[in-house]
């Protein structure tokens, strides 16, 4: 890798969760490959050898999910005894907030905000009410500030629960 011979090509495939050494990264050209939604579903179905929608309510899957995120969601549901096929997205969010799983589970630590955004976006598109658009905008801003200033996530999620899920 340091001084490869002529016509030598290395392909390094990497899971984004694990970082390569900076010395290796500096010698690489990065290609970020992104699957479209249909390919994500197709790839997930191939990995599972089954149809993903037999196990998950479509409201819980986003067009931005990866096959790994969908499979991790299935694993998360098995660990926490959640029936993803029958649970609605608002029931799912309430369950996560009540059990504080956004603090306890690595998958939820990194993906919970996307479920919150998806639910708010669903409210905005379904109802066409300005109230939800303002809440969506407010949540995005508060979420960014929470991350930027390392603020308490619990107050953010309780505020979300009170204003959106119970409001």
Region annotations inferred by a language model:
Residues 19, 32, 111:
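Amphipathic alpha-helical recognition patches that constitute DNA-binding helices
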Residues 22-38:
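A short helix-turn-beta junction within AAA+ P-loop NTPase domains corresponding to the substrate/partner-engaging
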Residues 15-18, 35:
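Short acidic/polar capping segments at secondary-structure boundaries
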Residues 7-8, 31, 51:
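Secondary-structure boundary/capping positions in well-ordered alpha/beta enzyme cores
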Residues 1-12, 19-22:
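Conserved catalytic/switch belt of AAA+ P-loop NTPases
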Residues 42-167:
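AAA+ P-loop NTPase domains with strong preference for DNA replication initiators
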Residues 8, 38-42:
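Short, surface-exposed, polar/charged, turn-prone segments marking secondary-structure boundaries
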């Amino acid at each position: 890798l340091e001084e490869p011979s002529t016509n030598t090509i290395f392909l390094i495939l990497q899971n984004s969760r694990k970082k390569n050494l900076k010395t290796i990264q500096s010698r690489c050209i990065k290609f970020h490959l992104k699957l479209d939604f249909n390919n994500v579903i197709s790839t997930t179905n191939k990995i599972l050898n089954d149809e993903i929608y037999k196990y998950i309510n479509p409201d819980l899957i986003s067009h931005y999910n990866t096959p790994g995120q969908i499979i991790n969601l299935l694993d998360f549901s098995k660990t926490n005894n959640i029936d993803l096929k029958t649970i609605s997205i608002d029931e799912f969010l309430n369950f996560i907030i009540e059990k504080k799983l956004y603090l306890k589970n690595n998958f939820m630590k990194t993906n919970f905000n996307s479920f919150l955004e998806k639910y708010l976006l669903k409210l905005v598109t379904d109802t066409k009410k300005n109230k939800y658009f303002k809440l969506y905008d407010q949540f995005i801003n508060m979420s960014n500030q929470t991350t930027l200033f390392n603020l308490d996530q619990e107050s953010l999620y309780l505020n979300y629960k009170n204003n959106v899920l119970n409001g």
